[in-house]
């Protein structure tokens, strides 16, 4: 069939499909793929779809030897090798006549000038009509739209008439294909498998992303720092670092005195380190350098709280009814510690000298329970009570070291808390500088000799004798910045309801996740998955054995009698295997039987059975046979139990070697001195002693023993 007829037939089929879509005629798709559950109209399309899962590309190009999954793709590719239209000026080839004619017109100068003039006239005519506005506002869109704003009957679900719901979890999906893809989560199927590492994935896109890990190619490159990435999403996330650096340079800088500085000394000390590169300068000698410049990212004019972005600042509202408190939904954004940490990271990325003293100069800001107690109390708060509640949070933090013993360390409290201290008429104007020369130990104890809080006037606000009591348990969660969910039974606090519900399982004793292998139950699914790995590691030792002696007393009567073995193996399906032994003296006959477990594969059982039969027949270490029974209850890796002393071993070879102790046999004999040994390594190590005594003689090691 000529190529033009094939293309015409394919175009006719596509036109027919487009007409069906335009008329919204239902299409019958009775053929379903059993791997990804897609529907198809004909069995030929289903067979063509199976090539995706198998990875076959049967159609090969004769010119460049490229493979394609469909014949149409091959025919379209062959057109690239046959370009009938060639340009005489630039020697370019084209496969389409229309594109070739357009290309020829580009070489014509008159045509090129006519196009420029025409485009210039079109732009001049459009300017007075539309002006500079290229888009409509929201009100203009409603004016142009036939529906009114108050039309309550209009619903977005009219555009999606066919909404498919999952019968298991009740989720809604706009198409059947997405519902089928979602059903793979409940069935646990992962049809797309990696050829290199045998990992399986639920979607083909996930497999393609995973396959990039096996290759060293990084096609997506950053235009700023020339760093390469394998995924485009990681490149876009990386570019945000460069954009943040540009926006950081545009932040306003203000100069304030130490009395009105709202940011802690941590940020100012870090910024001075970037500018000067010297952390050794004393803060007491020049305090203005510490508070000279600070960055105001997005600050509220009323309560002087700092926020990460302008959007969070616009959502922040300081109302008198709230008493200056931040709403609960914005608590995370107002976490002072995280804001300072992010600003320091931005300063470090923006440029500056890196110093080891920066890491040693890490300081932490501590929140107090003072505001909470002040809100509950109606009158003037007790000074002694506020002193106890404020300092108690210091004992709940970890180790805190100073840079040197000579210098004191200062910690600044947030300005909003300082303002609250001043508004309570306590008689002191607290600047909020915590000076300490001591070290807080890991157990939370505080050395109170050099620990005190000073106000802006330099007078001592809280002395050493006041720092002895602690907060209540509820105050420990004020500075976390998360939504707290307390447990009503044990008074534990959790950041989310899901973690609280998981904690309730401890009080109820429920363990909803059961192991289908050993029957153990777990409280979390992660613990169950981690436990299942222990069963996967035991698959090489797929059969569980136990050895029983017929008569233990007869083991020690004739230790030197010869034993002849007759092994017979039955390999029908998962059948049993027997190994009979006959001895010259009166020893009870013993049989070896294997009973495979249900959860293990038959191939592993058969390979283990054949291996054990050959090991028993070929080795003459043991003169007695044993019977093996399944013992799946052990989960510590010791699967093979001795019936005499009840010891457990990890492999049958170690168990056989152990039985030589009960039998009193030492099959390895030294040909020089006549000593016998239970193991071959012991015998070889003994042979070296004779070699050292007689270095000139050659000791021949019999490898057949």
From Swiss-Prot:
Matches recorded under Gene3D superfamilies: Classic Zinc Finger
One term under GO cellular component: nucleus
S-S bonds: none
UniProt cross-link Glycyl lysine isopeptide (Lys-Gly) (interchain with G-Cter in SUMO2), position: 16, 116, 124, 149, 266, 698
Keyword field: DNA-binding, Isopeptide bond, Metal-binding, Nucleus, Repeat, Transcription, Transcription regulation, Ubl conjugation, Zinc, Zinc-finger
Zn finger spans (C2H2-type): 31-53, 59-81, 85-107, 164-186, 192-214, 220-242, 298-322, 485-507, 513-535, 640-662, 668-690
Record-linked InterPro entries: Znf_C2H2_sf, Znf_C2H2_type
GO molecular function: DNA binding; zinc ion binding
Domain of life: Eukaryota
Pfam families referenced in this protein's UniProt entry, alphabetically: zf-C2H2
Family affiliation: Belongs to the krueppel C2H2-type zinc-finger protein family.
PANTHER family: ZINC FINGER PROTEIN, ZINC FINGER PROTEIN 770
Protein name: Zinc finger protein 770
Gene label: Znf770
């Amino acid at each position: 069939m000529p190529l033009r007829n094939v293309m015409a037939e394919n175009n006719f089929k596509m036109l027919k499909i487009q007409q069906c879509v335009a008329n919204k005629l239902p299409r019958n798709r009775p053929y379903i793929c059993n791997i990804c559950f897609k529907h198809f109209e004909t069995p030929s399309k289903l067979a063509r779809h199976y090539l995706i899962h198998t990875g076959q590309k049967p159609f090969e190009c004769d010119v460049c030897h490229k493979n394609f999954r469909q014949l149409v793709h091959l025919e379209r590719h062959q057109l690239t090798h046959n370009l009938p239209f060639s340009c005489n000026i630039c020697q370019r080839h084209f496969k389409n006549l229309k594109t070739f004619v357009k290309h020829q017109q580009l070489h014509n100068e008159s045509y090129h000038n006519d196009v420029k003039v025409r485009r210039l006239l079109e732009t001049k005519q459009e300017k007075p009509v539309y002006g500079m506005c290229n888009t409509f506002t929201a009100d203009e869109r409603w004016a142009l739209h036939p529906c009114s704003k108050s039309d309550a009957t209009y619903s977005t679900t009219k555009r999606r008439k066919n909404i498919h719901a999952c019968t298991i979890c009740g989720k809604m999906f706009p198409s059947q294909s997405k519902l089928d893809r979602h059903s793979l989560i409940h069935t646990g199927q992962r049809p797309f498998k990696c050829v290199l590492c045998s990992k399986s994935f639920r979607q083909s896109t996930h497999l393609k992303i995973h396959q990039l890990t096996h290759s060293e190619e990084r096609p997506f490159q950053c235009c700023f720092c020339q760093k390469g990435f394998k995924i485009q999403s990681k490149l876009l996330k990386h570019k945000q670092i460069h954009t943040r650096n540009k926006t950081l340079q545009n932040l306003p800088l203000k100069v304030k005195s130490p009395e009105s500085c709202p940011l802690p000394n941590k940020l100012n000390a870090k910024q001075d380190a970037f500018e000067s590169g010297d952390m050794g300068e004393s803060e007491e000698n020049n305090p203005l350098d510490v508070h000279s410049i600070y960055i105001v990212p997005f600050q509220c004019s009323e309560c002087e709280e700092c926020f990460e972005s302008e959007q969070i600042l616009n959502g922040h509202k300081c109302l008198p009814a709230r008493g200056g408190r931040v709403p609960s939904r914005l608590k995370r954004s107002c976490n002072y510690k995280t804001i300072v940490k992010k600003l320091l990271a931005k300063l470090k990325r923006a440029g500056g000298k890196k110093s080891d003293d920066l890491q040693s100069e890490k300081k932490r800001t501590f929140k107090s329970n003072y505001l909470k107690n002040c809100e509950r109390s109606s009158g003037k708060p007790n000074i002694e009570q506020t002193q106890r509640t404020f300092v108690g949070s210091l004992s709940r933090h970890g180790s805190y070291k100073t840079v040197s013993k000579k210098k004191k360390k200062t910690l600044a409290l947030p300005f909003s808390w300082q303002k609250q201290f001043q508004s309570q008429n306590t008689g002191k104007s607290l600047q909020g500088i915590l000076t300490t020369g001591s070290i807080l130990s890991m157990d939370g104890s505080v050395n109170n000799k050099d620990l005190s809080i000073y106000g802006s006037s330099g007078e001592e606000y809280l002395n050493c004798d006041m720092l002895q009591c602690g907060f209540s348990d509820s105050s420990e969660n004020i500075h976390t910045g998360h939504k707290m969910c307390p447990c009503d039974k044990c008074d534990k606090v959790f950041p989310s309801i899901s973690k609280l519900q998981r904690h309730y399982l401890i009080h109820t004793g429920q363990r909803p996740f059961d192991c289908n292998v050993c029957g153990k139950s777990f409280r979390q699914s992660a613990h169950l998955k981690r436990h299942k790995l222990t069963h996967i590691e035991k698959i090489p030792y797929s059969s569980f054995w136990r050895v029983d002696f017929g008569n233990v007393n007869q083991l020690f009567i004739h230790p030197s009698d010869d034993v002849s073995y007759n092994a017979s193996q039955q390999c029908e399906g998962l059948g049993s295997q027997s190994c009979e032994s006959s001895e010259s003296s009166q020893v009870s006959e013993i049989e070896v039987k294997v009973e495979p477990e249900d959860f293990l594969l038959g191939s592993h059982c058969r390979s283990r059975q054949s291996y054990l039969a050959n090991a028993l027949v070929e080795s003459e270490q043991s003169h007695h046979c044993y019977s093996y029974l399944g013992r799946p209850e052990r989960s510590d890796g010791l699967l093979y139990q001795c019936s005499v002393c009840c010891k457990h071993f990890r492999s049958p070879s170690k168990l056989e070697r152990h039985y030589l102790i009960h039998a009193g046999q030492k099959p390895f004999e030294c040909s020089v001195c006549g000593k016998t040994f239970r193991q071959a390594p012991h015998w070889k190590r003994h042979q070296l002693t004779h070699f050292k005594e007689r270095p000139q003689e050659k000791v021949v090691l019999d490898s057949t023993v």
